Amino acid sequence: MIKNITPQEAWDKLENDSDTVLLDVRTTMEFEYIGHPVGAIHVPLMEAPGWQTDPAFCEKVRETLHQSHDMAPEDLTILALCRSGARSGTAAELLTTEGFKSVYNVIEGFEGDRDENKHRGEINGWRYHGLPWEQS
């Protein structure tokens, strides 16, 4: 079962555990233009226009983490993040199935849930909570 973590809990974990990484699984366009958490590693789960899960997603995560960390990628704590927590939940399940031992889904995501006016970023999410982020 995938563990859920709030954006604030995720930031605290990142600040206090050097074996924890934040994995942003949104599309490249979202990551670059909407913004992303400072220090996040980016490996898209899917891209437009097909919007199909990348069959090489787990291997790409493994390769990316292997290049940036001294320990085995499977032994790192991974905090998966997307726009609102849905795609990152799927990513977390895939990574767990592929042998990653400690994977969390960052609920609320980067932009958060939609409010009554269908706007994101007004009720929750990484940016809403004032956590560090940047744009490319």
Report each predicted region and the residues it spans.
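Rhodanese-like catalytic fold shared by cysteine-dependent sulfurtransferases
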Residues: 1-21, 28-77, 88-136
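Short, surface-exposed ligand- or partner-binding patches at beta-edge/loop junctions that are enriched
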Residues: 81
